[in-house]
């Protein structure tokens, strides 16, 4: 194995290491299969999220569940606690399987000489106790303290604004806002393309 000398931080486990939108859509579609209005609103929220303008947080996820619970009405009402419990269970099951299929990426990055950490502010992910995942409620503070050489993320607000002096930024997705603010940024479609740019 090559000497690990390049410091890489993967700033968002959910949106960079795997396709969180795909997982979230599957869970929400299952929970709210009898609520087309909620599914329509959810698609709009995901479009806004894809622009990288809004940061992601557990607080935001919980607020989303509260609103969806209210919108579920009376006839097919779903309580907040039921939504939360079902979401957590399905998330952990789906994500654990996806993560196990991508362990080779960690080894590949190590072999290319990168020391790295994977950040998450998602308590569900943290409770899976997976390799090299660090749980933090304040990613911004962590990134400022670590100040990595390379930063891989998906959201300007959550990730890049906290590390203005990185040698290179890699964005998973379109990164519209990120491209407006950063010069040394490369966009990739998914994590499978990371080896083309690192």
What do these predicted ranges mean?
Residues 1-4, 128-151, 155-198:
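Asp-based, Mg2+/Mn2+-dependent phosphohydrolase catalytic module
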Residues 1-59, 63:
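Active-site neighborhood of HAD-like aspartate-dependent phosphohydrolases
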Residues 10-13, 18, 119, 152, ...:
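Short hydrophobic segments within beta-strands
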Residues 16-18, 23-24, 123-126, 156-158, ...:
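Short, solvent-exposed loop/turn segments at secondary-structure junctions
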Residues 40-92:
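A metal-dependent, Asp-based hydrolase signature
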Residues 85-96, 126-136:
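Glycine-rich phosphate-binding "P-loop"
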Residues 86-117:
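Short, acidic loop-to-helix structural element flanking the phosphoryl-transfer center
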Residues 115-131:
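Glycine/proline-rich, flexible active-site/cofactor-binding loop segments
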């Amino acid at each position: 194995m090559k000497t690990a000398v390049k410091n890489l931080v993967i700033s968002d486990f959910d949106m960079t290491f795997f396709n969180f939108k795909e997982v979230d859509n599957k869970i929400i579609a299952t929970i709210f299969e009898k609520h087309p209005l909620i599914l329509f609103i959810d698609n709009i929220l995901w479009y806004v999220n894809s622009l990288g303008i809004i940061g992601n947080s557990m607080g935001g996820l919980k607020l989303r569940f509260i609103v969806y619970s209210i919108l579920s009405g009376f006839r097919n009402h779903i309580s907040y606690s039921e939504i939360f419990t079902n979401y957590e269970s399905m998330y952990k099951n789906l994500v654990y399987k996806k993560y196990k299929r991508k362990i080779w990426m960690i080894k590949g990055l190590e072999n290319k000489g990168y020391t790295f950490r994977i950040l998450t502010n998602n308590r569900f992910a943290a409770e899976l106790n997976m390799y090299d995942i660090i749980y933090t409620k304040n990613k911004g503070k962590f990134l400022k303290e670590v100040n990595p050489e390379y930063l891989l993320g998906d959201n300007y607000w959550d990730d890049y604004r906290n590390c203005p002096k990185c040698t290179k930024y890699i964005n998973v997705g379109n990164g519209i806002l990120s491209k407006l603010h950063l010069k040394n940024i490369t966009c990739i479609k998914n994590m499978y393309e990371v080896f083309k740019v690192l």
